[in-house]
């Protein structure tokens, strides 16, 4: 089906189930914080709820902004602020053309000035590694279009969007972010040592403690 402005699919209203979700591929590229030493994306993504923007052109970047821009989706930024550091936004600029990649590097200083310093390690430029097989596996069917992925703490793709956002897709993304943040909080609580967990509950009577919920993988 052909969608408006290159949109290749409409997003689910609910999260993909954990046991059915595919993993987001590990990519390697430079960041605004590390322009000379490439970094792995998985090292940054693992352990946090992540909203990942994936794009390879200015047009595609403008499309992902309709999902994750502060003015286009203020509810998402409220979640970033209230649930930090459990949730983060990551930008991945895929630039396989050598000349365009060189131009991006030349103007990285402008992006550093524009972005919050906290976002510098979360802005990647990836030159290679995103093969056709990987693109197909994550639903990136049109390299000219921007894509947004919501990942859980184990780098599993729990939701995805493409092209310009529609109102119901923004709602689905934000609901998914809140749900994964809650899952992450429960996961962290289940991993607390017993003494620390009891201290956080404010009780010293083990019989009155609420049960610890352990999240299954």
Predicted region positions:
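Short coil/turn segments at secondary-structure boundaries
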Residues: 64-67, 102-105, 137-138, 162-164
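Intrinsically disordered, serine/threonine/proline
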Residues: 16, 20, 35, 42-43, ...
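Well-ordered, non-membrane alpha-helical segments in soluble/globular domains
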Residues: 61-77, 104-108, 173
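N-terminal "domain-start" segment that seeds a small globular fold
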Residues: 2-41, 64-66
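Eukaryotic short linear interaction motifs
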Residues: 36-38, 60-61, 97-100, 133-135, ...
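Thiol-/selenol-based redox modules, centered on thioredoxin-like
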Residues: 132-137, 142-217
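Short active-site neighborhood of thiol/selenol oxidoreductases, capturing the structured segment around
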Residues: 39-72, 89
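Short, internal strand/loop/helix patches
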Residues: 88-92, 100-142
């Amino acid at each position: 089906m052909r969608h408006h402005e290159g949109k290749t699919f409409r997003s689910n209203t609910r999260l993909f189930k954990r046991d059915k979700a595919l993993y987001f591929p590990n990519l390697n590229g430079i960041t605004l914080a590390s322009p000379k030493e490439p970094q792995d994306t998985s090292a940054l993504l693992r352990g946090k709820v992540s909203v990942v923007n994936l794009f390879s052109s200015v047009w595609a970047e403008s499309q992902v902004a309709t999902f994750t821009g502060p003015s286009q989706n203020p509810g998402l930024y409220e979640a970033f602020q209230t649930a930090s550091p459990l949730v983060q936004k990551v930008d991945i600029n895929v630039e396989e053309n050598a000349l365009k990649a060189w131009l991006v590097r030349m103007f990285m200083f402008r992006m550093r000035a524009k972005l919050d310093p906290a976002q510098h390690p979360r802005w990647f430029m990836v030159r290679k590694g995103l093969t056709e097989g990987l693109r197909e596996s994550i639903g990136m069917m049109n390299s000219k279009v921007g894509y947004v992925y919501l990942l859980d703490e184990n780098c599993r793709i729990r939701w995805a969007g493409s092209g310009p956002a529609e109102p119901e897709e923004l709602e689905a993304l934000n609901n998914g972010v809140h749900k994964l943040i809650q899952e992450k909080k429960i996961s962290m609580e289940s991993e607390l040592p017993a003494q620390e967990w009891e201290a956080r509950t404010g009780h010293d009577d083990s019989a009155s403690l609420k049960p610890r919920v352990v999240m299954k993988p």
